[in-house]
């Protein structure tokens, strides 16, 4: 299969291979060889670029070579141009001080909007893109919202069925350090902690 050839070539060239044990494999390409290798994968028969995602490792617990990375999902679609169903990911690290990569829109048309999304949300510039501009955020929004150091505004949000979430408490709950969900009850807010105390008290009374 094509995937076996990809892995054999990666090992021979000294490219790291990452395996999450769940059937997903990443080949880590050096930025200076990225476009050349992507063109090679296209010629090899990876006829579909399924996705492109940006990553910011600013607060990641394990050290990475660079703050940013871009991941590409390549597929050899069966039944189209002799595809055999092979699938793997390409990861390329991008330095914070020079966040640029060459575009792959000339190889896969599906890269057009995907690269624009990564550019908009992470600020990674894809050189040679035919129309590199914002795609999700307002034109007057400064910065890139998926960068870990982007200053997010916070507004308490009332959801359907009376659920009320306060951002700071919600974040606390996600860390596991403190209950975070609160509820909107008849014009007042009753925190999760208070509801839990009421439940414990009711259980004690019940015996």
From Swiss-Prot:
It is an enzyme of class 7 (translocase). It comes from the Bacteria. InterPro entries: NADH_DH_suC, NADH_quin_OxRdtase_su_C/D-like, NADH_UbQ_OxRdtase_30kDa_su, NADH_UbQ_OxRdtase_CS. It holds the Pfam family Complex1_30kDa. It is found in: Cell membrane. The keyword Secreted does not apply. GO terms for molecular function: NADH dehydrogenase (ubiquinone) activity; NADH:ubiquinone reductase (non-electrogenic) activity; quinone binding. It catalyses: a quinone + NADH + 5 H(+)(in) = a quinol + NAD(+) + 4 H(+)(out). It is a peripheral membrane protein. PROSITE patterns: COMPLEX1_30K. Its EC number is 7.1.1.-. Gene3D superfamilies: NADH:ubiquinone oxidoreductase, 30kDa subunit. The keyword Translocase applies. GO terms for cellular component: plasma membrane. Keywords: Cell membrane, Membrane, NAD, Quinone, Translocase, Transport. Belongs to the complex I 30 kDa subunit family. NDH-1 shuttles electrons from NADH, via FMN and iron-sulfur (Fe-S) centers, to quinones in the respiratory chain. The immediate electron acceptor for the enzyme in this species is menaquinone. Couples the redox reaction to proton translocation (for every two electrons transferred, four hydrogen ions are translocated across the cytoplasmic membrane), and thus conserves the redox energy in a proton gradient required for the synthesis of ATP. The Nqo5 subunit may be involved in the stabilization of the complex. NDH-1 is composed of 15 different subunits, Nqo1 to Nqo15. The complex has a L-shaped structure, with the hydrophobic arm (subunits Nqo7, Nqo8 and Nqo10 to Nqo14) embedded in the membrane and the hydrophilic peripheral arm (subunits Nqo1 to Nqo6, Nqo9 and Nqo15) protruding into the bacterial cytoplasm. The hydrophilic domain contains all the redox centers. HAMAP family: NDH1_NuoC. This is NADH-quinone oxidoreductase subunit 5. It comes from Thermus thermophilus (strain ATCC 27634 / DSM 579 / HB8). The gene is nqo5.
């Amino acid at each position: 299969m094509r995937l076996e050839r990809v892995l054999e070539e990666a090992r021979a060239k000294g490219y790291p291979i990452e395996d999450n044990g769940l059937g997903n494999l990443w080949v880590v390409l050096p930025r200076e060889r990225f476009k050349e290798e992507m063109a090679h994968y296209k010629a090899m028969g990876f006829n579909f670029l399924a996705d492109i995602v940006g990553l910011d490792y600013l607060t990641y617990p394990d050290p990475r070579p660079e703050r940013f990375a871009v991941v590409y999902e390549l597929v050899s679609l069966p039944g189209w141009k002799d595809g055999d169903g092979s699938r793997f990911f390409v990861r390329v690290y991008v330095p914070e001080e020079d966040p640029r990569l060459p575009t792959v829109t000339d190889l896969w048309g599906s890269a057009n909007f995907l690269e624009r999304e990564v550019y908009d949300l992470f600020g990674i510039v894809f050189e040679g893109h035919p129309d590199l501009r914002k795609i999700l955020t307002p034109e007057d929004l400064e910065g890139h919202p998926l960068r870990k150091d982007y200053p997010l505004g916070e507004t308490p949000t009332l959801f359907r069925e009376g659920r009320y979430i306060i951002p700071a408490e919600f974040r606390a709950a996600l860390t596991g350090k403190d209950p975070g969900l609160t509820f909107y009850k008849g014009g007042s807010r009753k925190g999760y902690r208070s509801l839990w105390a009421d439940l414990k008290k009711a259980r004690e009374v019940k015996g």
